[in-house]
Amino acid sequence: LPPGISINPSNGDIYGTTDEVGASTFTVTVSGSNAAGDIRTASKTYLIKISDPDSFPYKVDFTLSGYSGSSTLSQFPVLVTFDSGISGFSYNSFASATAGDLRFYAANGEELPYEIETWDTTGVSRIWVRVGSVSGTNTVITAAWGDSSKTTAPDYVFDGSTWSNGYHAAWHFQNMSGVLTTDSTANNRHLTAEGGATTGTGQVGN
């Protein structure tokens, strides 16, 4: 467990306060015996994640108002766009020129995995954020940045975590390298172009 966090061995409650941010694992092992005296032991490993959005000096809230369905979307990637016209946003306030200090958080403080599709400090940047729960038109997520101690992007930015909820592949066609379009999931299902390309209007961009 992180420093300052303890587990009550009698009831399993986790309690305490810590300044350590990040993910850690711990294993709980329980042993007991039945009426015949047979001893049984079981173990389970847990992952605990601690985040601190308040460590970032710059934040912008985004309300996901475009979904009007009646069901709740779980672990759903949503598109967030940045540009200089957003109130409270400036590329110059980032501690990393490549947005290594960018983080996203749910309303409950959970850190959300994301993928940068394009990062353009002179124009519009496009980021896909995997939101744990999207319900109605008032789900709020927070973008945070500017912490000079967190300028290295987390692994989830690059490892396909954004698209891990059953997606077979995810392609951003403007990121074509020659004739190759890379798959953003961890499945590595890259595309090779055959013939010429034609740009058309899509559900999200062209």
Question: Where are the model-predicted features located?
Answer:
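Interdomain boundary/hinge segments at the C-termini of tandem beta-sandwich modules
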Residues: 46-52
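Extracellular and select intracellular beta-sandwich modules with Ser/Thr-enriched
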Residues: 38-46
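Extracytoplasmic low-complexity segments
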Residues: 149-206
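A surface-exposed beta-strand-loop module
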Residues: 111-141, 149
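Surface-exposed beta-strand/loop patches in extracellular or lumenal glycoproteins
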Residues: 70-95
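Short, solvent-exposed loop/turn segments at the edges of extracellular beta-sandwich modules
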Residues: 31-39
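Strand-loop-strand motifs at the edges of beta-sheets in extracellular beta-sandwich domains
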Residues: 2-19, 27, 123-126
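Boundary/junction segments of secreted and surface-exposed precursor proteins
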Residues: 52-74
